[in-house]
Amino acid sequence: GLTGCLSFINLKFKGSKIHSSSSTCEDAINFINVSGQVSNIDVKNAYSDGLDVDFSNVYIDKIKISSAKNDCVDVSFGKYFFKELELFDCGDKALSIGEKSVLKLDKITIDNANIGIASKDSSIALAKIAKLKNLKTCLAAYNKKQEFSGGVIKIKDFECIIYDKKINFDFQSTISINNEL
């Protein structure tokens, strides 16, 4: 069945703005097999995931999620370009990239999550600017499901303050930070 309070399936977006507040579903907003461009996504007080995107190829100008009890943003099986993300008070991962996804992003700001950015299961996350704080783990790349390999994270300009562990990755995965080499 559908997991989103607001689910978009087999659609092409062109400049849409989407807002969700105080959702009570597994995903506040869920995209499945969606393409095109979304101008703005704003989620406040999500019961579980803020934004869940599967099997899609989408460009999103701005995503702002504040207070999601699980992941703020979770993407899988797709190609994604996000221009700006602001993710605050995420119960688990602020940004989770999984299952053979490629995600490119210009700027991400994260404050308060278990894991800042997680790339897993043959996924690649490429970021220009990442400013993170108040995390248990800033960056994590790993293999979770046996049918996939590890995850990759590459960031050009990275800053993480107030954390327990800066990076965590397994033998199948890589994390590369240009301003720290």
Regions found by a protein language model. Name each.
Residues 1-181:
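Extracellular beta-rich repeat passengers
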